[in-house]
Amino acid sequence: MLGIITFIIIFGILVIVHEFGHFYFAKKSGILVREFAIGMGPKIFSHVDQGGTLYTLRMLPLGGYVRMAGWGDDKTEIKTGTPASLTLNEQGFVKRINLSQSKLDPTSLPMHVTGYDLEDQLSITGLVLEETKTYKVAHDATIVEEDGTEIRIAPLDVQYQNASIGGRLITNFAGPMNNFILGIVVFILLVFLQGGMPDFSSNHVRVQENGAAAKAGLRDNDQIVAINGYKVTSWNDLTEAVDLATRDLGPSQTIKVTYKSHQRLKTVAVKPQKHAKTYTIGVKASLKTGFKDKLLGGLELAWSRAFTILNALKGLITGFSLNKLGGPVAMYDMSNQAAQNGLESVLSLMAMLSINLGIFNLIPIPALDGGKILMNIIEAIRRKPIKQETEAYITLAGVAIMVVLMIAVTWNDIMRVFF
């Protein structure tokens, strides 16, 4: 149960942060955001703000989305002869077009619609008391659809495809960007929780409780200077010296550890502990505990994880295998393991997955943010927009590829994790 809760929390945070990036910069770019949804499937909760954005919480805690005006099948169609009721503002402009028979307003003006333009001219025409009349429609007017859903109209100037190229590019990039920021922030938080960043350039050590070194008398911040005569000046020297000193070590044999404690040099016999095929002496690298060191340490961890993910992506391209990919099932399995290991493991997993999600979404495949960014760049180079039909077909092809890949990855994960 704890694994499921951890999975939902991690996945939910990653999705909210990612989609908020798209949402925020779409608004800043003048694009009307129809809906900001967390989860998929039937609505559990919904709220419409003054800007016309519908915020929804949906039943399945898997994914989420930001729906912008001008994307896909976004146009509201009103059939000729459809009965409607119009609500006018003080200037005589239509501020509400009600097509629902279940939400009637007795103060509104009844009309049978014969024509309309809610994108360019912003007008609606119809029969009012058997007389044809045309009314101007306010830029921020709303439509109550037949099922009772109220949405804002989307004039051309607030549709996605009519925003500036720069606005669209930053809107598409903002999701992955937010994932990178989240990953960096969580890694920095993790370093602070751990007390600092391991200092691999030093030979000062932290001594593990009940470990071999602790039993021999070593204490935190002691300085190991030699192991079996091998000089130690850094953590790498220490690990190599332990490896060399224990290479032919018998079951009950010890090694000599020379260390400096409170300016006094001491040599003790330490009995290494065997773990799998390697020996350890129960010490960790000392920590750099300065505020700046912690900040830089978090950035270093984030860069290290990003570099690892990029190398894995390179390996995936040169030698594709489903076993190198993981979907929601694999993510649940990792969340379950992290939950059992405590808060630091959960935070580490969240940070890694956030950076992973950011990099994955920048792959230039249609339907991913990277594919949209690529089309923005092509449009900027050509200095003319890509036809909407062409863009729609390209996106549809990308969606089909991603759906097939996701099904294959999920099936592979199920077989790997549960069987």
UniProtKB/Swiss-Prot annotation:
EC number(s) stated in the UniProt entry for this protein: 3.4.24.-
InterPro entries per record: PDZ, PDZ_sf, Pept_M50_Zn, Peptidase_M50
Molecular function terms, GO-annotated: metal ion binding; metalloendopeptidase activity
Protein residues bound to Zn(2+): H18, H22
Segments traversing the membrane: 169-191, 301-323, 343-365, 392-411
Gene Ontology cellular-component terms listed: plasma membrane
GO biological process, one term: proteolysis
Localization: Cell membrane
Presence of keyword Phosphoprotein: no
Pfam families in alphabetical order: PDZ_2 (PF13180), Peptidase_M50 (PF02163)
CDD domains, alphabetized: S2P-M50_PDZ_RseP-like
Gene3D superfamilies assigned: 2.30.42.10
Predominant place of localization: membrane
Keywords: Cell membrane, Hydrolase, Membrane, Metal-binding, Metalloprotease, Protease, Transmembrane, Transmembrane helix, Zinc
Catalytic class of the enzyme: hydrolase
Domain of life, source organism: Bacteria
Active site, renumbered: E19
Membrane topology: Multi-pass membrane protein
Record-annotated PDZ domain positions: 175-274
Cofactor(s) this protein requires: Zn(2+)
Stated family: Belongs to the peptidase M50B family.
Name assigned to this protein: Putative zinc metalloprotease SPy_1963/M5005_Spy1674
Lineage, opening ranks: Bacteria, Bacillati, Bacillota, Bacilli, Lactobacillales
